[in-house]
Amino acid sequence: MVASCKDQKKAVAICLQRSPCVMIERHNPQECLDNPELNKDLPELCIAQMKAFLDCKRGIVDMTKRFTGNAPLSTGKYDQQYENLCKGKFDPREEMEKLKLLNSQQKD
């Protein structure tokens, strides 16, 4: 994975882990993305972050960005949060509240 898309990838993973599809319905994140029935219920924040990640990946192969660069290198902003979610060190209710808060801020 190119370092410039690492933060976007982790942001998508964190958002999917917090989504009702994973937290409440107990599907895995891949099922939530692949299944159209589950995909339509994803929070707008997750969809926006997925779009940003795909744009970043597209920028890797875009020859016009080869000289100027795709994006800033990874900052490690989501590393600790990602590790906690992967290891199960989180409170599901708290994560759902965070997702609701982030989703409502994006709509404003």
Swiss-Prot record:
CHCH domain residues: 18-64
Disulfide bonds: C21-C56, C32-C46
Single GO BP term: mitochondrial cytochrome c oxidase assembly
Pfam families the UniProt entry points to: Pet191_N (PF10203)
GO cellular component, one term: mitochondrial intermembrane space
InterPro entries: Cyt_c_oxidase_assmbl_Pet191
Keywords per UniProt: Disulfide bond, Mitochondrion
UniProt motif Cx9C motif: location: 46-56
Principal location listed in the UniProt entry: mitochondrion
Motif (Cx10C motif): 21-32
Subcellular compartments: Mitochondrion intermembrane space
Alphabetized PANTHER family for the sequence: CYTOCHROME C OXIDASE ASSEMBLY FACTOR 5
UniProt record similarity statement: Belongs to the PET191 family.
Record note on domains: The twin Cx9C motifs are involved in the recognition by the mitochondrial MIA40-ERV1 disulfide relay system and the subsequent transfer of disulfide bonds by dithiol/disulfide exchange reactions to the newly imported protein.
Role, per record: Involved in the assembly of cytochrome c oxidase.
Official protein name in the record: Mitochondrial protein PET191
